[in-house]
Regions:
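Structured beta-strand/loop patches that form or line metal/cofactor-binding pockets in enzymes
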Residues: 17-62
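Active-site phosphate/pyrophosphate-handling residues
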Residues: 42, 73, 128
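Short, thiol/selenol-centered motifs that function as redox-active sites or metal-ligating centers
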Residues: 62-69
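Alpha-helical support elements that line or immediately flank enzyme active sites
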Residues: 71-83
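Alpha-helical macromolecular-interaction surfaces
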Residues: 69-70, 89
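A generic structural motif
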Residues: 62, 80-81, 133
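Glycine-rich phosphate/pyrophosphate-binding beta-alpha loops
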Residues: 36, 66, 126
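C-terminal binding/interaction regions
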Residues: 1-25, 84-163
């Protein structure tokens, strides 16, 4: 079996049998992203550990092409259980690969099934499809981190006021 065919099979499998699809509660942040070019959309929820250091859950719902929906499924598999820093490095690595127009192969050790989207980089119109869920994740982490920092700041402010 050719490598390209294997990659297509991985994408099709994640599209037909998505992982982590279905919005779950509780969650720390929720974002909704739409690709205005084609209408693909995703609502993505992120839950971080109490200290904000680890991704404990990601769930999503959406509609769109096989690339956008499969890429979001792969994203969830890769980042759940990772530290926020490592998860964001994975997002960066995926983004670089699919935006490279074929010049960056991607690291299978880092990207796992995400490597199947390497061929997308040769089709600029599809890059936004592949990145939709990944950028939604990045935005949700920023939102969750900001809210946990705000809670911590308010808590410390309240402690000072009580003294």
């Amino acid at each position: 079996m050719r490598l390209e065919q294997m990659y297509q099979d991985v994408i099709l499998d994640h599209y037909k049998h998505p992982h982590h699809r279905g919005l779950r509660e509780p969650f720390g942040a929720e974002v909704h992203h739409v690709n205005p070019t084609c209408g693909d959309e995703v609502t993505l929820r992120v839950t971080l550990s109490e200290d904000g250091e680890q991704v404990t859950d990601v769930s999503y719902d959406g509609q769109g092409c096989s690339i956008s929906q499969a890429a979001t499924s792969v994203l969830c598999d890769l980042v759940i259980g990772e530290t926020v820093g490592d998860a964001l490095k994975t997002v960066q690595s995926f983004s670089e690969m699919v935006s490279s127009r074929g010049t960056v192969d991607g690291d299978e050790e880092v990207l796992g099934d995400g490597i199947a989207f390497a061929g997308v980089s040769k089709y600029p119109a599809r890059v936004k499809c592949a990145l939709l869920g990944w950028f939604a994740f990045k935005a949700a982490v920023a939102q969750a981190t900001a809210s946990s920092e705000a809670v911590a700041e308010a808590y410390h402010h309240d402690l000072k006021e009580m003294r």
